[in-house]
A protein has these predicted regions:
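Sec/Tat signal peptide C-region and signal peptidase I cleavage site
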Residues: 30-33
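N-terminal "domain-start" segment that seeds a small globular fold
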Residues: 35-67, 87
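Local sequence-structure signature of Cys/Sec-based thiol-disulfide redox active-site neighborhoods
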Residues: 70-75
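Bacterial N-terminal signal peptides
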Residues: 17-28
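N-terminal secretory signal peptides that target proteins for export/translocation
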Residues: 1-12
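Amphipathic alpha-helical repeat scaffolds
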Residues: 78-82
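Structural microenvironment flanking redox-active thiols in thiol-disulfide oxidoreductases
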Residues: 85-149
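Thiol-/selenol-based redox modules, centered on thioredoxin-like
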Residues: 151-154, 158-207
Length: 207
């Protein structure tokens, strides 16, 4: 009887130890699976350096990685609500609606660097939607020139040797992110020369 009980006890210890080993093994596998959900190094490598920034969206201030626009032609514009060039919002929206299916995205960055965007993000978002029906992506109010400029605008300035001189300055980034051209505030987004350059960039193959 005692030998039978000892046998059962030994069997119980063996099964318990085996179960613990299995649990530990499975526990070690979970983090590895979780890591696979992160963006791979290969995907990151495709994103051009000029887009490797995370910025807050205007409407809800949630972070957004600009790498999601990899392979598109990107037009970056610093905007303001009380500027003589503010009606360019209409042209920018028309441009976006006309070319977004061909690979263009317009990114708007409100700024008070020239003292013509005093409102907070919510007021700016309401103005853009209610006045011009803006649908292209807009981001939180930011600094676009000088020592306090955002990293994105610092790089755009470095790549073109031109910082925004006024509101509605424009930077056109090629699909592969290797070419960046700047356009001053007086260049309307629907200007024929600008559209010619845009068509050229859109016709380039996606990297």
């Amino acid at each position: 009887m005692i030998e039978h009980m000892m046998t059962l006890y030994s069997l119980h210890r063996f099964l318990t130890s085996t179960a613990c080993v299995l649990c530990l093994s499975l526990g070690m596998l979970v983090p590895a699976a979780a890591q696979n959900n992160k963006p791979s190094a290969n995907n990151d490598a495709k994103c051009p350096a000029v887009l490797q920034y995370t910025v807050d969206r205007l409407q809800d201030e949630k972070p957004q990685n600009l790498c999601q626009y990899t392979g598109q032609v990107v037009l970056v514009v610093n905007t303001a609500s009380f500027c003589g060039f503010t009606p360019q919002y209409k042209s920018l929206e028309e441009l976006y609606a006309r070319y977004k299916d061909k690979g263009l995205v317009v990114l708007g960055f409100p700024s008070n660097d020239f003292s013509q965007e005093p409102g907070n993000n919510q007021k700016i978002a309401d103005f853009c939607e209610n006045t011009y029906g803006v649908k292209f992506p807009m981001f939180s109010k930011t600094t676009v020139r000088g020592a306090d400029a955002s990293p994105l605008f610092k790089q755009l300035t470095q790549l073109t040797d031109t910082a925004p001189k006024w509101n509605f300055y424009k930077y056109l980034i090629s699909r592969d992110g290797k070419q960046v051209k700047s356009y001053n505030s007086t260049t309307d987004p629907l200007d024929s020369k600008f559209l010619a350059e845009l068509d050229k960039q859109l016709s380039a193959k996606t990297p």
